[in-house]
Amino acid sequence: MEMLPNQTIYINNLNEKIKKEELKKSLYAIFSQFGQILDIVALKTLKMRGQAFVIFKEIGSASNALRTMQGFPFYDKPMQIAYSKSDSDIVAKIKGTFKERPKKVKPPKPAPGTDEKKDKKKKPSSAENSNPNAQTEQPPNQILFLTNLPEETNEMMLSMLFNQFPGFKEVRLVPNRHDIAFVEFTTELQSNAAKEALQGFKITPTHAMKITFAKK
């Protein structure tokens, strides 16, 4: 029997070797593009290994995430996604703290986020001044240049985003610079397809990735 759409999606067939904190960060990175995430639950108990729950604020966000990310290769294993059996019942049983106020527990979070929003307004203004020119000036290249990446970005996270595109070769991070990276493809056509698809992809709610062709 199919589950009715709700804010919580259930994911299984996850790689059991990934540490819990890294798993949660990576899930957040690929699912935050669909809408505000209230919580991610991933436990390493024997019964719950290879499974996780992502709780969105809106049902529409959960529906888009389920439809778009079904079968997405995540740490070399295709994700299997379904709606949770009921809005938060399973999560409540797992966490033991989620039952009474599943949606009221999280709303205080926007308060500290107000500073981030101010930063968000400042940062794009400086980035946008230089980037549009870069995008028009650089001719096609099989190597892409990524900017505006958040501090928690790592090679595995970017590889998961880009390896779904044909011709993906490698991700190259820049030492002592968390905000930029290079991604190489076999041909310029392949790199352009990835560039068009992931332009503006939100790795976190405050960081929309900017992609240009690298200088030749």
Curated annotation (Swiss-Prot):
GO terms for biological process: female germ-line sex determination; mRNA splicing, via spliceosome; oogenesis; primary sex determination, soma; regulation of alternative mRNA splicing, via spliceosome; RNA splicing. Belongs to the RRM U1 A/B'' family. Residues 97-142 are annotated as: Disordered. GO terms for molecular function: identical protein binding; mRNA binding; poly(U) RNA binding; pre-mRNA intronic pyrimidine-rich binding; snRNA stem-loop binding; U1 snRNA binding; U2 snRNA binding. Keywords: mRNA processing, mRNA splicing, Nucleus, Repeat, Ribonucleoprotein, RNA-binding, Spliceosome. SMART domains: RRM. GO terms for cellular component: catalytic step 2 spliceosome; nucleus; precatalytic spliceosome; protein-containing complex; ribonucleoprotein complex; small nuclear ribonucleoprotein complex; spliceosomal complex; U1 snRNP. It is found in: Nucleus. Binds stem loop II of U1 snRNA. It is the first snRNP to interact with pre-mRNA. This interaction is required for the subsequent binding of U2 snRNP and the U4/U6/U5 tri-snRNP. Plays a role in regulating sex-lethal splicing. Residues 7-86, 142-216 form the RRM domain. The keyword Cell inner membrane does not apply. It comes from Drosophila melanogaster. Residues 126-142 have a biased composition (Polar residues). Transmembrane segments: none annotated. This is U1 small nuclear ribonucleoprotein A. The keyword Transport does not apply. The gene is snf. Belongs to the spliceosome where it is associated with snRNP U1. Interacts with the SMN complex. InterPro entries: Nucleotide-bd_a/b_plait_sf (IPR012677), RBD_domain_sf (IPR035979), RRM_dom (IPR000504).
